């Protein structure tokens, strides 16, 4: 499969992720490749409060036609990438450009604007119930469901640390 792809935790997906996925789609269109997003299976702690299903649902709302794959304990990013053509391209944030050197693909690094949204900021806004900040960072409403999942994961992480 000849693709332009990106990989991330997307926990939660935010406007910076959306911008990166738009770059994946645009680059894929120009290069006549398939745009793909691979969602990490990381889940169940303060940094990873949303499940693959939660993250995929949000990404598919933004980009209904997008191919979204996910890693798992038995299916690593490297294993998924074995199905990609050697001329495939990976799009990553500039801060992650060296993190994927184990993959044999050309990488296209995107500069991160100063004041760019971050999942850490979005999770903090959710924890504080700050719906306006959350929406400014993510582009979607902070639902009770998302807020509860983020709060619950943070509480579980705190309990693990204190024992």
Identify the role of each PLM range.
Residues 1-163:
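Nucleotidyltransferase catalytic core that binds NTPs
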């Amino acid at each position: 499969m000849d693709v332009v792809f990106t990989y991330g935790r997307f926990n939660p997906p935010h406007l910076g992720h959306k911008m990166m996925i738009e770059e994946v789609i645009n680059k894929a269109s120009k290069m006549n490749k398939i745009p793909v997003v691979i969602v990490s299976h990381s889940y169940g702690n303060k940094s990873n409060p949303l499940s693959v299903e939660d993250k995929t649902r949000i990404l598919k709302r933004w980009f209904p036609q997008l191919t979204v794959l996910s890693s798992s304990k038995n299916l690593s990013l490297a294993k998924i990438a074995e199905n990609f053509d050697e001329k495939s391209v990976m799009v990553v944030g500039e801060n992650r450009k060296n993190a994927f050197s184990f993959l044999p693909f050309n990488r296209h690094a995107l500069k991160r604007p100063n004041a760019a949204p971050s999942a850490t900021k979005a999770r903090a806004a959710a924890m504080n119930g700050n719906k306006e900040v959350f929406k400014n960072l993510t582009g979607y409403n902070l639902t009770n469901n998302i807020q509860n999942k983020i709060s619950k994961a943070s509480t579980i992480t705190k309990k693990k640390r204190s024992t």
